[in-house]
């Protein structure tokens, strides 16, 4: 094992990376409220794991979506638990994100030189809400259907570009299979990818600049 470690150490400098991670200075004013961002990340990882598990059984079609969700809840071993954890973690992620934003704002964590960290955080907040909007529709029950119809109909009030924007969101003039497919793609591929990218940027900037000082 020693030779294997030495081989990787020579090429990757693992010890230097470990020393950097474990030797970061933590200001004395830091308290439990500074953990809200980390809790949000943990919730996101839980979402990825449970969501990935459900993709093995979920069918993104208007005729089979609801039945596949019922199958997960009733027939799949611990399917009810996986979906319940996914829902609970989603609510927790939104709550922790909101509290994290308030903490950063109230402690002045958005000020120079951390403006870009704040910008990436705001983008992550928008992505988090987008997860909720797209995920809510996937069971394709009455609540999900009408929620999608209302949400996608909101941009219609925008002059000139309103109607084309609605058609872009729905995939057609009315809510249907194209809408569900788009929301499923957003929820399971595009939004997780964007969230991972901006989270990486967010944490790298925090590592570089450190935690903001007290007011």
From Swiss-Prot:
Give one Pfam hit by family name. Cytochrome_B
The answer to whether UniProt assigns keyword Membrane to this entry is yes
**Which spans are transmembrane here?**
32-52, 90-110, 116-136, 186-206
Cofactor remark from the record:
Binds 2 heme b groups non-covalently with two histidine residues as axial ligands. Binds one heme group covalently by a single cysteine link with no axial amino acid ligand. This heme was named heme ci.
Keywords noted in UniProt: Chloroplast, Electron transport, Heme, Iron, Membrane, Metal-binding, Photosynthesis, Plastid, Thylakoid, Transmembrane, Transmembrane helix, Transport
Q: Which InterPro entries does the record match to this protein?
A: Cyt_b/b6_N, Cyt_B6_PetB, Cytb/b6-like_sf, Cytochrome_b_N_euk/bac, Di-haem_cyt_TM
An annotated GO cellular component of this protein is: chloroplast thylakoid membrane
Q: Which domain of life is it from?
A: Eukaryota
Task: Give the protein's cofactors.
Answer: heme b; heme c
User: Topology versus the membrane, per the UniProt entry?
Assistant: Multi-pass membrane protein
Residues the entry annotates as binding heme b 2: 86, 187
Binding positions (heme b 1): 100, 202
A biological process (GO) of this protein is: photosynthesis
A GO molecular function term, named singly, is: metal ion binding
Q: Where in the cell is it found?
A: Plastid, Chloroplast thylakoid membrane
Carries keyword Magnesium? no
Residues the entry annotates as binding heme c: 35
Q: Give the quaternary structure.
A: The 4 large subunits of the cytochrome b6-f complex are cytochrome b6, subunit IV (17 kDa polypeptide, PetD), cytochrome f and the Rieske protein, while the 4 small subunits are PetG, PetL, PetM and PetN. The complex functions as a dimer.
Give a short account of what the protein does: Component of the cytochrome b6-f complex, which mediates electron transfer between photosystem II (PSII) and photosystem I (PSI), cyclic electron flow around PSI, and state transitions.
Give the note: Heme 1 (or BH or b566) is high-potential and absorbs at about 566 nm, and heme 2 (or BL or b562) is low-potential and absorbs at about 562 nm.
Q: Which family does it belong to?
A: Belongs to the cytochrome b family. PetB subfamily.
Q: What is this protein called?
A: Cytochrome b6
Originating species: Welwitschia mirabilis (Tree tumbo)
The organism that produces this protein has a lineage beginning with: Eukaryota, Viridiplantae, Streptophyta, Embryophyta, Tracheophyta
Query: Gene name on record?
Result: petB
């Amino acid at each position: 094992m020693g030779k294997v470690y030495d081989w990787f150490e020579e090429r990757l400098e693992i010890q230097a990376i470990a020393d950097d991670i474990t030797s970061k200075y933590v200001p004395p004013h830091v308290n439990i409220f500074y953990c809200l961002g980390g809790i949000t990340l943990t919730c996101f990882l839980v979402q990825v794991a449970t969501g990935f598990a459900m993709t093995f059984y979920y069918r993104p079609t208007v005729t089979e979506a609801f039945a596949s969700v019922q199958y997960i809840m009733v027939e799949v071993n611990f399917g009810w638990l996986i979906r319940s954890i996914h829902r609970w973690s989603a609510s927790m992620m939104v709550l922790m994100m909101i509290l994290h934003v308030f903490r950063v704002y109230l402690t002045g964590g958005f000020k120079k030189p951390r403006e870009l960290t704040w910008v990436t955080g705001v983008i992550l907040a928008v992505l988090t809400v987008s997860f909720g909007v797209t995920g809510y529709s996937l069971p394709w029950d009455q609540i999900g259907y009408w929620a999608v119809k209302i949400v996608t109909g909101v941009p219609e009030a925008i002059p000139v570009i309103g109607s084309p924007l609605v058609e872009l969101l729905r995939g057609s003039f009315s809510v249907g299979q194209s809408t569900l497919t788009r929301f499923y793609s957003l929820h399971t591929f595009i939004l997780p990818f964007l969230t991972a990218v901006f989270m990486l940027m967010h944490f790298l900037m925090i590592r570089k600049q450190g935690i903001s000082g007290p007011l």
